């Protein structure tokens, strides 16, 4: 529950600071990391770029 609340607050913070509204959804099509919420990055899946969790180094 706390994680969901935190994600919601981060998305609302992005909207409040003037960024484009984003949907916090795994696998959402994107053009850059700005199209994704904090815990996701815009990564290639081979065919297209989608919001996914960053696997790290």
Swiss-Prot record:
GO terms for cellular component: extracellular region. Expressed by the venom gland. It comes from the Eukaryota. GO terms for molecular function: potassium channel regulator activity; toxin activity. Residues 14-18 form a propeptide. Disulfide bonds join 24-37, 30-42, 36-51. Transmembrane segments: none annotated. Keywords: Disulfide bond, Ion channel impairing toxin, Knottin, Neurotoxin, Potassium channel impairing toxin, Secreted, Signal, Toxin. Negative results: does not show effect on rNav1.2/SCN2A and mNav1.4/SCN4A. This recombinant peptide inhibits voltage-gated potassium channels mKv1.3/KCNA3 (IC(50)=1.70 uM), mKv1.1/KCNA1 (10 uM inhibits 40% of currents) and hKv1.2/KCNA2 (10 uM inhibits 42% of currents). May also increase intracellular calcium release through the activation of nuclear inositol 1,4,5-trisphosphate receptors (ITPR) of cardiomyocytes, thereby causing an increase in the contraction frequency of these cells. Belongs to the scorpion calcin-like family. KTX subfamily. This is Potassium channel toxin KTx1.
């Amino acid at each position: 529950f706390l994680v969901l609340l935190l994600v919601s607050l981060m998305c609302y913070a992005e909207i409040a600071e003037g960024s484009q509204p984003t949907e916090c959804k795994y696998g959402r099509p994107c053009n850059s990391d700005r199209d994704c919420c904090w815990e996701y990055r815009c990564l290639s899946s081979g065919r297209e770029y989608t919001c996914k969790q960053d696997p790290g180094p």
